[in-house]
Amino acid sequence: ALGGGLEVALGCDYRVALDSARLGLPEVKLGLLPGAGGTQRLPRLVGAQKALEMVVGGNPVKAKEALSLGLVDEMVSGDLLDGALAYTRQLLADNAPLRKLRDLAVSDAQDGLFDQFEQSIARKQRGFKAPFSCIKAVRAAVELPFDKGVERERELFFELLVSPESAAQRHVFFAEREVAKVPGPVSYTHLRAHETSRY
């Protein structure tokens, strides 16, 4: 589950993933930040430090790491639906409580964490707005109530959406995808040089 898929999953009480799954929020690579409350729920689940690494870096984690972080609650092999249904039956049998991430506090948000993280990426990310907006969004998860944090996330998202940096990053991303669709290699072996006269 990448991007929107993980954001939807974070809105659920429990999450089940295949053992081959990769989970992440790569929007920063498009000059954006995760939406739908992703920057607000993720820190409440995995802690501020790991959320910063995932949101600002945009790199996914494998299912095994996601399980150890608490990002997913169950990892299955084989058929995902069968595994998810079996886990759901177990939760019901155990009378497991509903869990709303919005109600959790963010752990491990020690003083100076955000400033230190910003300094650590300053040189490498110079000229890019999205990584710094991602830091602001995760910081909002720590400092603001959930609903206010989601509002701040939305404001930051729309600022990035209309920025020239994001437009350029999205253009490059989609251009690279289109290049891959060119049918077959182009051959110029059938062309021959011809002498031409001037005028």
List PLM regions with ranges.
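Glycine-rich beta-to-alpha active-site loop
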Residues: A1-L30, P34, K62, S197
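Amphipathic alpha-helical segments at domain termini/boundaries
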Residues: E7-G11, M54-L156, F174-A175, A180-Y188
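Conserved structured core elements
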Residues: L33-A36, L45, E65, G78, ...
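Hydrophobic, secondary-structure "cap" segments at the distal end of domains
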Residues: T39-Q49
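Glycine-centered loop/turn positions within well-structured domains
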Residues: Q40, L52, R198
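Long amphipathic alpha-helix in the N-terminal Rossmann-like dinucleotide-binding domain
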Residues: R89, E155-A168
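Conserved small/polar residues in nucleotide/adenosyl-binding loops
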Residues: T189-T196
